[in-house]
Amino acid sequence: MPLLEDFAAAQERVKKLSRSPSNEELLELYSLFKQGSLGDAQGKRPGMLDFKGRAKFDAWTSKKGMSRDAAMQTYVDLVTRLVARYG
């Protein structure tokens, strides 16, 4: 299956997990999804009081320079591990 199809399928699989992944795992999923979909982070870093938005933005910027294909493949691999762990 081509990478784009694997990436789309992984997005559907992660929605069906029986338990929610940890916050760290969710941030990793988010950052890989954004990097795979859009490339390097864009826009301004959220303000100090937007803890959730800031954490998400920082996770995404941590992937700066990673190719979209590498991010998509890493996302697919992570979802596969999470499905094995959380069902």
Place the predicted regions along the sequence by residue:
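A charge-rich, low-complexity, intrinsically flexible signal that marks solvent-exposed coils, linkers
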Residues: 1-87
